[in-house]
Structure formats: structure tokens, C-alpha cells
A protein has these predicted regions:
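Feature captures the catalytic ectodomains and active-site-proximal regions of enzymes
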Residues: 1-153
């Protein structure tokens, strides 16, 4: 576990620990993990500060780190990129007021299978639907309670 930096507010260090997390994961690529879950908190935590320029820097940092990770892991892992809520994508309302709270906007969902096979996904899915695709990747049977929950068409 790599700790977040000790700063009063994250707009002072919008990159947080993203580069350290990325470097550590790349350094441990050869460990052969079955599953890796990574959370870049930058866009969320910096978004809460209301500082647009810092939020832009946070998004650029995460974009850079995801690109580096994709280039290393794309041939060995299925990759899912998503979020559980928005924040940094909408920081100013129609009246010019600063927004520091989570949004209810749709978030991206990217599934990049290492096999590059084409998979059709629902247009309107929910966070609960992500579990189904993770179970498929890990070749684990879906519990009966999840019968209606799938992001795959």
C-alpha cells in the first residue's frame, strides 16, 4: 500500500502518489498476479478542493499513468477503466459557482480485453454490472443473485 502525500489539501500536490503507484505496479509486473485492482484517487480528491487548475493537473497525471500501465499490461491482462462517480469533470455550475461535490454524471467504462476480441456492452449500465465482467475474466461462475446484472450484451 502506497500512502497518499501528507498535505493540507490535495490541490497542493495533485499528482498525489500516482507516479509511485504506477512505478511500483510496473516494477512488480513479473509477479504474475491473477487480478490487480488499482484506484487513482486524484481526480476525486483534488476535485473536492474546487481548484480547477489543480484538477486538470490531476486528470493529466492519471491519464499519463494509465497510458504507461496500459503499454506494460495490455498483452497480459484484461483491463477495465471506470469510476464509481464523477467529480473533476464538472467543477463550475451554470452560474459560475464552484462545485466540490461528487456528480451523478455518467462515467466512462472501458473494457480492453487482451485478446482484442470484440465485445458489445450496454449503453446504460450501472456500477453493479461491473462485477459480472470481472467474474468472466477470472472464469468464476456468476452467483444466481446476479442473474440480471451484466454489462455485456
Amino acid at each position: 500500500l502506497i500512502p497518499s502525500p501528507k498535505v493540507p489539501t490535495y490541490d497542493l500536490k495533485p499528482e498525489m502518489s500516482a507516479y509511485e503507484v504506477t512505478d511500483t505496479l510496473i516494477k512488480n509486473f513479473d509477479k504474475g498476479f491473477d487480478f490487480i485492482l488499482l484506484n487513482f484517487a486524484n481526480c476525486d480528491m483534488v476535485g473536492h478542493t474546487g481548484r480547477l487548475s489543480a484538477a486538470i493537473s490531476a486528470v493529466e497525471t492519471v491519464d499519463n499513468c494509465i497510458g504507461r500501465l496500459y503499454n506494460v499490461f495490455k498483452d497480459s491482462y484484461d483491463i477495465i477503466i471506470t469510476a464509481d462517480h464523477g467529480n473533476a469533470e464538472e467543477m463550475i455550475d451554470e452560474n459560475g459557482n464552484i462545485i466540490t461535490a461528487h456528480t451523478t454524471n455518467k462515467v466512462p467504462f472501458l473494457y480492453l480485453p487482451r485478446t482484442l476480441k470484440e465485445i458489445k456492452l450496454k449503453d446504460n449500465a450501472y456500477l453493479r454490472d461491473v462485477a459480472d465482467i470481472v467474474l468472466r475474466i477470472l472464469d468464476i461462475d456468476k452467483p444466481i443473485e446476479m442473474a440480471e446484472s451484466s454489462i455485456i450484451l
